[in-house]
C-alpha cells in the first residue's frame, strides 16, 4: 500500500513539474480556454437533436422493392386499388403478407391496416380505429379459412 502511494505521489510530481498539465500564460495575447465559449446570440439552452435536413421522409412501406412514404403509398398504391374494389385479402397477398404469424412484423403491415380502414369507410361509411383494424385483420381476414 505504501509503495503504491509513493509511486502515485512521484508520478504526480513529475507530471506537474514536467509541464504535462495545462499551462497558464500571463501574456494578454495568449489565452487557454477550458469549458464553454460564451456567445452573444440568443439560443436555446436545451440541446436539440440535429434535424435530417435533406427533406427525405422515412420509408413507411416497401412494395415490390420500392420504398415509399405514407403519402406516396396512399396516393399511388392504396387509392387505385380501392377504386378498383380490391378486397383486403388480395391486397395482403399482393403486398407479400402470406402468413398470419408474421403479419404484424411485416414491413407493409401499417399499409394493410390503413387500407382496411379506407376500405371500411368506402363500403360502410364508418371510420375505424387502428387498433380495431388490426384486430379485424388478425381475427377475421388473415385466417386459415382465407389461406393465410
Swiss-Prot record:
Compartments it resides in: Secreted; Host cytoplasm; Host cell membrane
Coiled coil: none
Residues carrying a glycan: 32
Keyword entries, A-Z: Glycoprotein, Host cell membrane, Host cytoplasm, Host membrane, Membrane, Secreted, Signal, Virulence
GO cellular component, one term: extracellular region
Major site of localization recorded for this protein: secreted
Domain of life, source organism: Eukaryota
Signal sequence, renumbered to the chain: 1-22
Sequence motif RxLR-dEER, location on chain: 44-58
Domain-level remarks: The RxLR-dEER motif acts to carry the protein into the host cell cytoplasm through binding to cell surface phosphatidylinositol-3-phosphate.
Entry function: Effector that suppresses flg22-induced post-translational MAP kinase activation in tomato but not in Arabidopsis. The perception of highly conserved pathogen- or microbe-associated molecular patterns (PAMPs/MAMPs), such as flg22, triggers converging signaling pathways recruiting MAP kinase cascades and inducing transcriptional re-programming, yielding a generic antimicrobial response. Also partially attenuates INF1-triggered cell death.
Family per record: Belongs to the RxLR effector family.
Identification of the protein by name: RxLR effector protein SFI7
